[in-house]
Amino acid sequence: MRKFYTLFSREVRGYFHSPIAYIVLIFFLIVSGIDFYFQVSFMNQRQVQYTIQEAFFNSVFFWFAFVLIFPLITMRLFAEEFKLGTIEPLTTVPVRDWQVVLAKFFGALVFYIILWIPTLLYFAIFLKVTNEPAAHSAGAYAGSYLMLLLLGMFYLSIGCLTSVLTRNQIIAAIISFCAITLLFFLGLVQFILLDVSSETRDLLGYFSAIEHMGTFSRGVIDTRPIVLYVSMTIVMLTLTHQAFQSRKWRL
């Protein structure tokens, strides 16, 4: 466990010594801040049936930033190590391959969680200024951030897999972006194709991140997306472990 913690600490520190991490952080805070401002402005002009918290987590700005951050967070995880040759010491010291994979994954997950902490201030400021809560209940907040965690775990695991397949960070980012975007738009097919059967629509809805976020942001916790994203994260990390072992033996 001590070896895992050492690797994990190394990964977390690596983010805060990397310029790209601060670029991602600044980009995300700017886009999320603009998103929150526009949602508040829109709701001041019109009567709506949803809360500012629901609007924030289901807007175009939100999904634009959300899809973009994962390739940027994960592109360096393995690709940079293979390119610089710093992966070789990890293959000779007495650490297990799964410890390396999980340390990189959880290091990325910690940075991802840190990105979302400032958004809690948005809702606190909204409550302070308007004297009204941004959500109907605490469950709505919990559901929103739980879905952020689940989606984040899944998309980060995809980024881990794409990063271990190449030594070029840009290629890793492009592959990750394409894979995540494809999965994202798969959930939109049910809204685009109007002539599909109800069974097909339900199946596509099962994979729709937008629908899942819409449900959880209302405080409705559905166990099916939880099972889906946790199981798919495990699958992606297992594939990453296998790919890492394969590349390690070719060094």
What is the meaning of each model-derived region?
Residues L29-F42:
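Alpha-helical transmembrane segments of multi-pass membrane proteins
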Residues I34-Y37, T51-A65, G107-Q169, I221:
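Secretory targeting signals
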Residues F57-E80:
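Long, hydrophobic alpha-helical segments
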Residues M1-L25:
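Aromatic- and glycine-rich beta-strand/loop motifs that create alpha-glucan
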Residues F70-T74, Y122, S157-I158, L239-T240:
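Hydrophobic/aromatic residues in alpha-helical transmembrane segments
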Residues L77-G107:
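Helix-loop-helix units of permease transmembrane domains in multi-pass membrane transporters
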Residues P19-S32, A108-W116, I175-F191:
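Hydrophobic alpha-helical membrane-insertion segments
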Residues Q39-Q53, A172-A243:
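Terminal transmembrane helical anchor/hairpin motif
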